[in-house]
């Protein structure tokens, strides 16, 4: 039997054990994982450096290298994320609704695990731990398929977590890493309906499209982040500049960073905003008017409006009003995160009602589209689809429901 099927069978068996565990048992296991990662951080960092060295030699972009890299600070954040998930309320077993029928049947809708989740993701090794902590907390087993560029890091993390589980109620076979990162094995994984209950892809547009187009297993689709900020005519100067700088520059390589700023043509501080971005090393690609007015602005192409740069590059366009901004977002947005900066409440209502995206912001950075920032703990991904879950996906998003019907001998006669 090949690696994929062996691990899938182990996961399916482990998921049956997981579904029966108490919240206390799951939390205790997460604490052991947190302690083990802390204890073995030197090993993890050494393995990550192997991936980083290979990535540099292969010419990976700065954005991908940033996603790949682990540091002591990032490991601290990973450990904190595991403990935060442990501290969150366990949704499994929650009674969502309950009612009694005229014939005396008492019906409950309760929250239960999905079963076995397949995670398909790219260079970010922190996703390995985020996915495991969320899945175990909700009683799900997880098959991890990371990228070849992060294989050393992922193997180290999974080995540490499996070892930690040996002293807990959770079987170590509840976590499996698919070490064969070939395209052929991935395609087989996408069709493993007898073992996997859902696939969750996290990564670039190509990865997500490959999973969506080739999977027969249901997919919880996470989306590309071509995110926009609209700076309205009434936007307060310092607030607008601060938000745009944060949304672009705090971490340009992530999906909730902005890629386009739409500016009302009568906003008085266009030049100050562009100068602030330019001074911080942002490459600006603007419409014809902006390119003609500012020597450091390159004229944008049609492709620029579509592009998720994941880098310190920003497309900028002047618009006549909120409706033109909305139409631009309709055409080029990816339904991830969109923001409006304005003091006009009517424009806020119009923007919120008209724009189709998982998360909309008024006078705040798009960088808050994040499970931890939403209070969910580490996130499993950010969904841009509309079925089952949308936006940052925390614990509830990776559960489903079942109906429990309590009777006293009722039979159906009609």
Swiss-Prot record:
Belongs to the gamma-glutamyl phosphate reductase family. PROSITE patterns: PROA. It comes from Geobacillus thermodenitrificans (strain NG80-2). This is Gamma-glutamyl phosphate reductase. Its EC number is 1.2.1.41. Keywords: Amino-acid biosynthesis, Cytoplasm, NADP, Oxidoreductase, Proline biosynthesis. Signal peptide: none annotated. The keyword Protein transport does not apply. Gene3D superfamilies: Aldehyde Dehydrogenase, Chain A, domain 1 (3.40.605.10), Aldehyde Dehydrogenase, Chain A, domain 2 (3.40.309.10). Catalyzes the NADPH-dependent reduction of L-glutamate 5-phosphate into L-glutamate 5-semialdehyde and phosphate. The product spontaneously undergoes cyclization to form 1-pyrroline-5-carboxylate. It is found in: Cytoplasm. Pfam families: Aldedh (PF00171). GO terms for biological process: L-proline biosynthetic process. GO terms for cellular component: cytoplasm. The lineage of its organism: Bacteria, Bacillati, Bacillota, Bacilli, Bacillales. It is an enzyme of class 1 (oxidoreductase).
């Amino acid at each position: 039997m090949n690696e994929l099927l062996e691990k899938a069978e182990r996961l399916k068996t482990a998921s049956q054990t997981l579904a029966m565990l108490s919240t206390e048992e799951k939390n205790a296991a997460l604490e052991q994982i947190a302690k083990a990662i802390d204890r073995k951080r030197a090993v993890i960092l050494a393995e990550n450096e192997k991936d980083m060295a290979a990535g540099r030699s292969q010419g990976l972009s700065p954005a991908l290298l940033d996603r790949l890299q682990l540091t002591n600070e990032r490991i601290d954040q990973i450990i904190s994320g595991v403990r935060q998930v442990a501290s969150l309320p366990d949704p499994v077993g929650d009674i969502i609704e309950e009612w009694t029928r005229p014939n005396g049947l008492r019906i409950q809708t309760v929250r239960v695990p999905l079963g076995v989740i397949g995670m398909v993701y790219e260079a970010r090794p922190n996703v390995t731990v985020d996915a495991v902590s969320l899945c175990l907390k909700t009683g799900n087993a997880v098959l991890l398929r990371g990228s070849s560029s992060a294989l050393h890091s992922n193997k180290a993390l999974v080995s540490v977590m499996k070892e930690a589980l040996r002293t807990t109620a959770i079987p170590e076979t509840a976590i499996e890493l698919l070490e064969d990162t070939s395209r052929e094995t991935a395609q087989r994984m996408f069709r493993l309906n007898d073992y996997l209950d859902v696939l969750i892809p996290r990564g670039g547009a190509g990865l997500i499209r490959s999973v969506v187009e080739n999977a027969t297993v249901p997919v919880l689709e996470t989306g590309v982040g071509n995110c926009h900020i609209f700076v309205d005519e009434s936007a307060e100067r310092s607030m607008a500049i601060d938000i745009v700088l944060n949304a672009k520059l705090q971490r340009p390589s992530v999906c909730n960073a902005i890629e386009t700023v739409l500016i009302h043509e009568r906003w008085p501080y266009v030049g100050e905003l562009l100068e602030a971005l330019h001074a911080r090393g942002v490459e600006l690609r603007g419409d014809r008017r902006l390119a003609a007015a500012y020597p450091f602005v390159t004229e944008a192409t049609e492709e620029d409006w579509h592009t998720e740069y994941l880098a310190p590059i920003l497309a900028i366009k002047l618009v006549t009003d909120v409706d033109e901004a909305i139409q631009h977002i309709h055409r080029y947005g990816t339904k991830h995160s969109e923001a409006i900066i304005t003091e006009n409440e009517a424009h806020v209502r119009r923007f919120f009602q008209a724009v189709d995206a998982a998360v909309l912001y008024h006078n705040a950075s798009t960088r808050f589209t994040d499970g931890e920032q939403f209070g969910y703990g580490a996130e499993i991904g950010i969904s841009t689809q509309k079925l089952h879950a949308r936006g940052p996906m925390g614990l509830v998003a990776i559960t489903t429901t079942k109906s429990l019907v309590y009777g006293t001998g009722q039979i159906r006669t009609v």
